[in-house]
Swiss-Prot record:
<dbReference type="InterPro" id="IPR015424">
    <property type="entry name" value="PyrdxlP-dep_Trfase"/>
</dbReference>
<dbReference type="InterPro" id="IPR005814">
    <property type="entry name" value="Aminotrans_3"/>
</dbReference>
<dbReference type="GO" id="GO:0008483">
    <property type="term" value="F:transaminase activity"/>
</dbReference>
<dbReference type="Pfam" id="PF00202">
    <property type="entry name" value="Aminotran_3"/>
</dbReference>
<dbReference type="GO" id="GO:0042286">
    <property type="term" value="F:glutamate-1-semialdehyde 2,1-aminomutase activity"/>
</dbReference>
<dbReference type="GO" id="GO:0006782">
    <property type="term" value="P:protoporphyrinogen IX biosynthetic process"/>
</dbReference>
<dbReference type="GO" id="GO:0030170">
    <property type="term" value="F:pyridoxal phosphate binding"/>
</dbReference>
<keyword id="KW-0627">Porphyrin biosynthesis</keyword>
<dbReference type="InterPro" id="IPR004639">
    <property type="entry name" value="4pyrrol_synth_GluAld_NH2Trfase"/>
</dbReference>
<dbReference type="InterPro" id="IPR015421">
    <property type="entry name" value="PyrdxlP-dep_Trfase_major"/>
</dbReference>
<comment type="subunit">
    <text>Homodimer.</text>
</comment>
<protein>
    <recommendedName>
        <fullName>Glutamate-1-semialdehyde 2,1-aminomutase</fullName>
        <ecNumber>5.4.3.8</ecNumber>
    </recommendedName>
</protein>
<feature type="modified residue" description="N6-(pyridoxal phosphate)lysine">
    <location>
        <position position="265"/>
    </location>
</feature>
<comment type="similarity">
    <text>Belongs to the class-III pyridoxal-phosphate-dependent aminotransferase family. HemL subfamily.</text>
</comment>
<keyword id="KW-0663">Pyridoxal phosphate</keyword>
<dbReference type="InterPro" id="IPR015422">
    <property type="entry name" value="PyrdxlP-dep_Trfase_small"/>
</dbReference>
<keyword id="KW-0413">Isomerase</keyword>
Length: 426
């Protein structure tokens, strides 16, 4: 047995499923998950000494690559001053100033510890500010594991939520309305059915949890218009897309102004950080200045703030996002070309430093139904054959891939060459 196999066997006796987040268990592709020893640049190194070109990037945060010296040094320096104070620090102010400067729609920002905390808190704030209970989310969009967001979508334009996790009361989930991503008709139907009851829409501007599905040109502006028409708030969940699709996020890339924005992943530089913010009048409703409660023992942790501050300063340097886009485009085009040569039907969506691989006969993938029609079994075989080639992709057909500026042209070429060999076996 490999060391990863031995560790996984031991972990399953001590940790549910052997992992601390379900997708890591390889249940989406089968087999034994890799246990990682270290990472540097664009590479992961497992406990058995094998190296992999990494396109997971810790599920998004590692836009600069692993073990970036500026972030590492910032963490070391901060740790020497103490690990946690439970009191305000200068770095929290500097971090808030940097974030609000980089994302102009955020007049104010509150730091939290994860993307889930950010979305959960933003939705509570929207409900408190509007005095309404219902929210709209979209099929295939994931916003963390808060109860109100763990809702299954059925067929049809509008579904009154049924929870898709035990432990979520149906009476609570009923306030979550699920609409079809990239379909404004379904959203209007929800508003017309509940014109005075919907507090907010929450949306991934690029859906990254049904692989990678960009918005149609009219979709995000249409959501903004519907929120304005019916008096609801628009929450854009930029946990994945923030500072990656563009410096000011997908909202800037697509030209839409939200009322609230949720951030995570890159904002922490690899440390556990989330944030939410937006219009000053809405944020003023948050405790301690307003009645909507939110708190966190480790929110604004000094080490996490130092890591995030260092990361964002690097990400803000000229040329970063152009490089991300060029590398991702080169990878996407190369994979499609290699698949076509092998007679394999393939679509690769990509926006900025995000991409998604779909085995499908369709020409485009634009919604949840398109994603679910893809060949998941072929993806599983592709994943494992690429792993044997030393390429680590997301271990699920429903998760986006992530590029970093640490990836080189040689890494991209080697990945395409590996895919060409793998396609010949599919």
């Amino acid at each position: 047995m490999s060391k990863s196999e031995n560790l996984y066997s031991a972990a399953r006796e001590l940790i549910p499923g052997g992992v601390n987040s379900p997708v890591r268990a390889f249940t989406g592709v089968g087999g034994t998950p890799l246990f990682i020893e270290k990472a540097d640049g664009a590479y992961l190194y497992d406990v058995d000494g094998k190296a992999y070109i990494d396109y997971v990037g810790s599920w998004g945060p590692m836009v600069l690559g692993h073990n970036h010296p500026a972030i590492r040094n910032a963490v070391i320096e901060a740790a020497e001053r103490g690990l946690s104070f439970g009191a305000p620090t200068e770095m929290e102010v500097k971090m808030a100033e940097l974030v609000t400067n980089l994302v102009p729609t955020m007049d104010m920002v509150r730091m939290v510890n994860s993307g889930t905390e950010a979305t959960m808190s933003a939705i509570r704030l929207a409900r408190g500010f509007t005095g309404r209970d219902k929210i709209i989310k979209f099929e295939g969009c994931y916003h963390g594991h808060a109860d109100c967001l763990l809702v299954k979508a059925g067929s049809g334009a509008l579904t009154l939520g049924q929870p898709n996790s035990p432990g979520v009361p149906a009476d609570f989930a009923k306030h979550t309305l699920t609409c079809t991503y990239n379909d404004l008709t379904s959203v209007r139907a929800a508003f017309e059915q509940y014109p005075q009851e919907i507090a907010c829409i929450i949306v991934e501007p690029v859906a990254g949890n049904m692989n990678c599905v960009p918005p149609l040109p009219e979709f995000l502006p249409g959501l903004r218009a519907l929120c304005d028409e019916f008096g609801a708030l628009l929450i854009i969940d930029e946990v994945m897309t923030g500072f990656r699709v563009a410096l000011a996020g997908a909202q800037d890339y697509y030209g839409v102004v939200p009322d609230l924005t949720c951030l995570g992943k890159i904002i922490g530089g690899g440390m556990p950080v989330g944030a939410f913010g937006g219009r000053r009048d809405v944020m003023d409703a948050l405790a301690p200045t307003g009645p909507v409660y939110q708190a966190g023992t480790l929110s604004g942790n000094p080490i996490a703030m130092a890591a995030g501050f260092a990361c964002l300063n690097e990400v803000a340097q000229p040329g970063i996002h152009e490089t991300l886009d060029e590398l991702t485009t080169r990878l996407a085009e190369g994979l499609c070309e290699a698949a076509q040569e092998a007679g394999i039907p393939l679509v690769v969506n990509h926006v900025g430093g995000m991409f998604g691989i779909f085995f499908t006969d369709a020409e485009t993938v634009t919604c949840y139904q398109d994603v679910m029609a893809c060949d998941v079994e072929r993806f599983k075989r592709f994943f494992h054959l690429m792993l044997e080639e030393g390429v680590y992709l997301a271990p699920s057909a429903f998760e986006a891939g992530f590029m970093s500026v640490a990836h080189s042209e040689e890494d991209i070429n080697n990945t395409i060459d590996a895919a060409r060999r793998v396609f010949a076996k599919l």
